[in-house]
Amino acid sequence: MSFSPLIRQLIDALRTLPGVGQKTAQRMALQLLERDRSGGVRLAQALSLAMEGVGHCRQCRTLTEQELCPQCADTRRDDTQLCVVEGPMDVYAVEQTGYRGRYFVLKGHLSPLDGLGPDAIGVPQLMARIEEQGSFTEVILATNPTVEGEATAHYIAQLLAEKGLVASRIAHGVPLGGELELVDGGTLAHAFAGRKPISL
């Protein structure tokens, strides 16, 4: 079946979403056009507003509509702990554990094969934040328990050790190869409670 140019454009746009292939994108497009045009209009408006109105927090780099996210703007949070995560979804996952410290969001993990080195994911900005804040006594490395996440945590731990700072790693109650955003709050809370210093 050959789709019109506008329908093809909609299908291609839907395929940019994670986990959405050609067939799923076709079903979504046809569902919106055939059965839920008002839902499609709401989706387009919400997407347009979010793309224009959502940016990154100037301190932790998570997604927010303000200059500072709610976590960074909250003066009651613990200024001695900094939790380093790979992405904004991980902040939401860690918040479910009751963690009350500060955050820093990397833009992924180290992956030399994909051209992602320390500069690409924001390690220099992380180190600058730690130096500027000056109050962190513990940096919790909550990168995903994947090979790349472990390598990222180890690299950052080495940089912190050179500055005499304590780095800890969340415990492995989180399944190896898993991603934080997919882990339930209880498992993640257990992993946080069992975190251990990284030995170099």
From Swiss-Prot:
One GO term in the molecular function aspect is:
zinc ion binding
Biological process terms in GO annotation: DNA recombination; DNA repair
Name the chain's protein.
Recombination protein RecR
Q: Which PANTHER family match?
A: RECOMBINATION PROTEIN RECR
Question: By its UniProt entry, which Pfam families does this protein fall under?
Answer: RecR_C (PF21175), RecR_HhH (PF21176), RecR_ZnF (PF02132), Toprim_4 (PF13662)
Coiled coil ranges: none
User: Per the record's keyword annotation, is Transcription included, yes or no?
Assistant: no
UniProt family annotation: Belongs to the RecR family.
Which keywords annotate this record? Answer: DNA damage, DNA recombination, DNA repair, Metal-binding, Zinc, Zinc-finger
Entries under InterPro entries matching the protein? DNA_Rcmb_RecR, Rcmb_RecR, Rcmb_RecR_Znf, TOPRIM_dom, TOPRIM_RecR
Q: Where are the zinc fingers (C4-type)?
A: 57-72
Q: Which residues form the Toprim domain?
A: 80-175
To which species is this protein native? Pseudomonas putida (strain W619)
Transmembrane regions listed in the UniProt entry: none
SMART domains of this UniProt entry? TOPRIM
Tell me the superkingdom of the source: Bacteria
Function summary:
May play a role in DNA repair. It seems to be involved in an RecBC-independent recombinational process of DNA repair. It may act with RecF and RecO.
